[in-house]
Amino acid sequence: MTDQQNTEAAEAQGPQFSLQRIYVRDLSFEAPKSPAIFRQEWTPSVALDLNTRQKALEGDFHEVVLTLSVTVKNGEEVAFIAEVQQAGIFLIQGLDEASMSHTLGAFCPNILFPYARETLDSLVTRGSFPALMLAPVNFDALYAQELQRMQQEGSSTVQ
C-alpha cells in the first residue's frame, strides 16, 4: 500500500486513538530538613504546580508530558519537594485541529494523571513522609481556561 492509500484508509475508518506507552520521564525528591523534620509536629501545607506539554513525534505519534511538582512545608520549613514527569506516547489520527488540540491538552493528561499521582505518592512514602493523596484534576476545565486566555490574547493555538 502507498502512503496515500494508508492515509485514505485511516480517514475511511474515522478518528483513531491509541496509547502506545506510559513512562516516567523524570523523577526527583528532596527532603532538605531530614532527619530533624521527622521529630517535629506534622502540620503540613501543600503547594502543587501542574504543567503539561506535548511534542509531535514521527508520523501520527505524539508525546505528552504531565509534570506534577509538590512542595510541602511543615510550618515555615520545607519538608520535601517532589516532582514527577509522567509521559505517554499516543498514536492519534484523523482529528481536526481543534479536536487534536483538546485531545493533547486535556484527554491525554487525564490518562496520565493517575499514574503520576501514584508515582508521586510512592516517592513521598518512600521518603518516610505520610501519603500524599492528590485530588482528581479536571483537565477539561483547565484546557478551557487556557483556551479562553489564549483567545483573549489573540492566539488560536493552545500550548
Curated annotation (Swiss-Prot):
Q: Does the keyword Chaperone apply?
A: yes
Q: Which UniProt keywords apply?
A: Chaperone, Cytoplasm, Protein transport, Translocation, Transport
Q: What is this protein called?
A: Protein-export protein SecB
Coiled coil ranges (UniProt) are none
Q: How is the subunit organization of this protein annotated in UniProt?
A: Homotetramer, a dimer of dimers. One homotetramer interacts with 1 SecA dimer.
Task: Return the InterPro entries for the record.
Answer: SecB, SecB-like_sf
Biological function: One of the proteins required for the normal export of preproteins out of the cell cytoplasm. It is a molecular chaperone that binds to a subset of precursor proteins, maintaining them in a translocation-competent state. It also specifically binds to its receptor SecA.
Describe the family membership recorded for this protein in Swiss-Prot or TrEMBL.
Answer: Belongs to the SecB family.
* Biological process according to GO: protein folding; protein tetramerization; protein transport
- Localization annotation: Cytoplasm
Q: Could you name the domain of life of the organism this protein comes from?
A: Bacteria
**GO MF annotation list:** unfolded protein binding
